């Protein structure tokens, strides 16, 4: 039993050492992650390996998105080019200038035609006046003044009762519408009409 007595103190010493110094990690039982609260280095390395395996896939997906975006941008650029090609080209500046010049020419032609019609109307009014020398050159303003004085003279003849029996034909009037054989008082009225008409050479 001597051996047993010798072994007992050694066993007690070994137990004391085990209490003071914990067992190495290789001999300790593995703990769950929930109990430890953090992952062991081996778990971290395995997680990193899994992340490393997943990252190429994620990069590939991002690359695919970028490629899709680039393709969409290329399609949009092609659509913009197609839309730009569908627009009508602007006319050259020379054609615009020619169009404006043609419009000016048309407006000038219309104005010349209007002036011709107006000149014909004034010439007819001048010939309708009773006795105007043919060599007399009258402006448009003088023609209008003579016509207004002639109309005023005819109205005066119609309003006066004393000329009912002795009707004076306009042909007997002399330019500028002076009635021969009329009294002096009537000649004053005619002179006032002459002042309205004005003298013309």
UniProtKB/Swiss-Prot annotation:
It comes from the Eukaryota. InterPro entries: bHLH_dom, E-box_TF_Regulators, HLH_DNA-bd_sf. Residues 1-108, 182-201 are annotated as: Disordered. The keyword Protein biosynthesis does not apply. A motif (Nuclear localization signal) lies at residues 66-71. One of its GO terms (cellular component) is nucleoplasm. Residues 46-56 have a biased composition (Acidic residues). Transcription repressor that blocks myogenesis and activation of E-box dependent muscle genes. Efficient DNA binding requires dimerization with another bHLH protein. Binds DNA as a homodimer or a heterodimer. Forms a heterodimer with TCF3. This is Musculin. It comes from Mus musculus (Mouse). The lineage of its organism: Eukaryota, Metazoa, Chordata, Craniata, Vertebrata.
């Amino acid at each position: 039993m001597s051996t047993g007595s010798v072994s007992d103190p050694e066993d007690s010493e070994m137990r004391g050492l085990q209490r003071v110094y914990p067992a190495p990690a290789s001999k300790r039982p593995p703990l769950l992650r929930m109990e430890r609260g953090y992952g062991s280095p081996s778990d971290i390395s395995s997680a990193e390996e899994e992340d490393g395996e997943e990252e190429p896939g994620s990069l590939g997906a991002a690359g695919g998105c970028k490629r899709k975006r680039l393709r969409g941008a290329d399609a949009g650029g092609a659509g913009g080019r197609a839309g730009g090609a569908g627009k009508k080209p602007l006319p050259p500046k020379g054609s615009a200038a020619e169009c404006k010049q043609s419009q000016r020419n048309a407006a000038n032609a219309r104005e010349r035609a209007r002036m011709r019609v107006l000149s014909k109307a004034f010439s007819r009014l001048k010939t309708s006046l009773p006795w105007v020398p043919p060599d007399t050159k009258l402006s448009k303003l003088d023609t209008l003044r003579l016509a207004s004085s002639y109309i005023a003279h005819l109205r005066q003849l119609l309003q006066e009762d004393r000329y009912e029996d002795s009707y004076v034909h306009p042909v007997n009037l002399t330019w500028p519408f002076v009635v021969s054989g009329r009294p002096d008082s009537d000649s004053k009225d005619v002179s006032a009409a002459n002042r309205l008409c004005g003298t013309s050479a």
